[in-house]
């Protein structure tokens, strides 16, 4: 959406000069018995701000795909294929980012470039949860099983460059553990991929404008929210957010943890919460024995295989003392790790739409509702809550993609 330009007028140069002379006591036609003013040295100009160090390491072409090929990939979603206007070239990028310990690491991602005649916006697309045995679903492989293969490729074909980070732990950094649902590293890896994408476009003379849109669902929704916050805090001038549309993310981690520990219903997602706990224990150096978190025999099983099957009842899986510590916030270090990964309570400046299925039992709807209420309470005027009625975590995903595209198309 175009902004109205407002003209600004300044005083004519002679008036400014006269005012300056008057302030010095030497205005024309004025006599003064005051001593001659001491010459004042002009203020020293601030040193030039050094541009940020480049992050792009390398690139390689994966392939080029026609609108007809891309449309065929989404034939099961009505009308989506008709949006594909341009052929799309897909590249694999490697770039430098920081791991959770602050050390530099080479990461990777995919860039989807429409063969378009004019400069286009950039979408940063953050993918959802990938289990360790789903490595080849990471964006830089561009496999037919990846999120970016179908609908996201069509988004590129509408006239958007798409920046799709693998995240740490996949692609070029697959030897490292993925910091699952760790807000800070998901945000920095995504921001640095966005920087690398724009560096690549400049290098290859690919026309992009200044618009940056942020999309992602599930873990990608959480990463998108964390990325939006980071960009507005650290990159407001160089990577301004035009609009973002996170979907079904676990934004209110501390409340989500209490919800799990209070639940008496079967929870299908407990294995992923085990992964979150393992990540936070490692990243924040809590170094608790597994017996602190889990009852037997699951503590022993998870020691042997971190991704072994766990029961669906929280009371059966988690140690009673641990459950109580979460519910009463009686473990300050643990509580601090959860709060550090809350990304729901801040004031976004750019337009933000929160999409979430109302019947989501994997990442409950209250995560988006809490974010909306907290942001509005802080004075955010451009945040919207977009419920997907009756949608579960999985059935709402196609609707999210279509509605998120419609949302960003306004800007």
Show the residue positions of the predicted features.
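Short, surface-exposed "cap/lid" segments of acyl-processing enzymes
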Residues: 100-108, 112-158
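Histidine-bearing beta->alpha loop at or near hydrolase active sites
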Residues: 359, 380-400
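Short beta-strand/loop motif that positions the catalytic acidic residue
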Residues: 348, 353-360
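Short alpha-helix in the alpha/beta-hydrolase fold that links the catalytic acid
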Residues: 109, 227, 350-352, 364-375
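Accessory cap/linker subdomain of secreted extracellular hydrolases
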Residues: 247-345
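Gly/Ser-rich "nucleophile elbow"/oxyanion-hole loop immediately N-terminal to the catalytic nucleophile
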Residues: 113-116, 195-215, 236-239
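Catalytic-loop region of hydrolases
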Residues: 34-118
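Alpha/beta-hydrolase active-site loop
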Residues: 180-202
């Amino acid at each position: 959406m175009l902004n109205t330009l407002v003209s600004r007028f300044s005083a004519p140069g002679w008036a400014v000069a006269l005012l300056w002379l008057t302030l010095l006591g030497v205005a024309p036609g004025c006599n003064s018995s005051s001593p001659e003013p001491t010459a004042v040295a002009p203020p020293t100009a601030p040193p030039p701000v050094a541009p940020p160090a480049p992050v792009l390491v390398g690139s390689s072409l994966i392939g080029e795909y026609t609108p007809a090929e891309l449309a065929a990939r989404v034939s099961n979603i009505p009308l989506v294929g008709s949006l594909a206007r341009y052929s799309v070239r897909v590249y694999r990028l490697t770039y430098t980012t920081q791991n959770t310990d602050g050390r530099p690491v080479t990461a990777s991602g995919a860039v989807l470039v429409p063969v378009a005649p004019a400069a286009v916006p950039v979408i940063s697309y953050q993918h959802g949860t990938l289990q360790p045995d789903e490595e080849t679903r990471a964006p830089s492989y561009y496999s037919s099983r990846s999120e970016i293969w179908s609908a996201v490729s069509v988004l590129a074909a509408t006239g958007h460059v798409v920046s799709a980070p693998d995240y740490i732990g996949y692609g070029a950094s697959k030897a490292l553990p993925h910091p699952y649902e760790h807000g800070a590293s998901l945000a920095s890896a995504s921001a640095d991929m966005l920087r690398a994408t724009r560096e690549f476009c400049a290098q290859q003379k690919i026309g992009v404008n200044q618009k940056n849109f942020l999309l992602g669902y599930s873990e990608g929704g959480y990463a998108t929210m964390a990325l939006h916050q980071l960009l507005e805090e650290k990159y407001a001038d160089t990577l301004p957010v035009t609009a973002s549309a996170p979907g079904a993310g676990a934004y209110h981690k501390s409340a989500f943890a209490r919800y799990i520990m209070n639940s008496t219903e079967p929870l299908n997602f407990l294995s992923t919460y085990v992964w979150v706990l393992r990540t936070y224990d490692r990243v924040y150096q809590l170094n608790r024995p597994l017996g602190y978190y889990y009852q037997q025999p699951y503590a022993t099983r998870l020691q042997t295989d971190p991704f072994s099957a766990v029961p669906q009842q929280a009371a059966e899986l988690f140690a009673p003392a641990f459950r109580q510590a979460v519910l009463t916030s009686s473990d300050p270090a643990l509580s601090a790790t959860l709060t550090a990964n809350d990304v729901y309570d801040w004031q976004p400046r750019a337009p933000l739409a929160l999409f979430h299925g109302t019947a989501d039992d994997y990442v409950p709807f209250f995560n988006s509702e809490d974010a909306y209420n907290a942001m509005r309470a802080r004075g955010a005027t451009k945040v919207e809550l977009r419920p997907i009625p009756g949608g579960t975590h999985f059935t709402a995903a196609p609707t999210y993609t279509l509605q998120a595209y419609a949302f960003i198309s306004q800007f």
